[in-house]
Amino acid sequence: MIRPIKKITLRKTKKKSPKGVIHIQASFNNTIVTITDLRGQVISWSSSGACGFKGAKKSTAYAAQIATENAIKQWTDQNTKQAEVMMSGPGPGRETALRAIRNSRVILSFIRDVTPIPHNGCRPPKKRRV
């Protein structure tokens, strides 16, 4: 008699890392907050657009604050409270996002600005003649 073959599946278990990295990307149009573990695996994320803000309201400081609070709320459910912060971009939500992190009682080990700066980069467009 033939026995049915049992399906062997691997269950993925999320490892709770003691520390996380909060990446804040603040552009002039939107603010994206991504929280990863130390290896770079995404744990939670949020953005101004994902929080329900549309159009010009996405680029406000208040939208960045709400996006940061949402991402941290998902992350702290896993009982992780220590983080590093990497900020990039010149947007208006940059300082507000950092203020929201400080208000959430997350222990910060360091804050680093990782905005890319060109070493004389691309040639600018020609001057406009009107």
Swiss-Prot record:
Single annotated GO MF: rRNA binding
InterPro entries assigned: Ribosomal_uS11, Ribosomal_uS11_bac-type, Ribosomal_uS11_sf
Name assigned to this protein: Small ribosomal subunit protein uS11c
Main location per the UniProt record: plastid
GO biological process, one term: translation
Localization per record: Plastid, Chloroplast
One Pfam match: Ribosomal_S11
Quaternary structure (record): Part of the 30S ribosomal subunit.
Similarity-based family: Belongs to the universal ribosomal protein uS11 family.
Highest taxon, organism lineage: Eukaryota
Species this chain originates from: Chara vulgaris
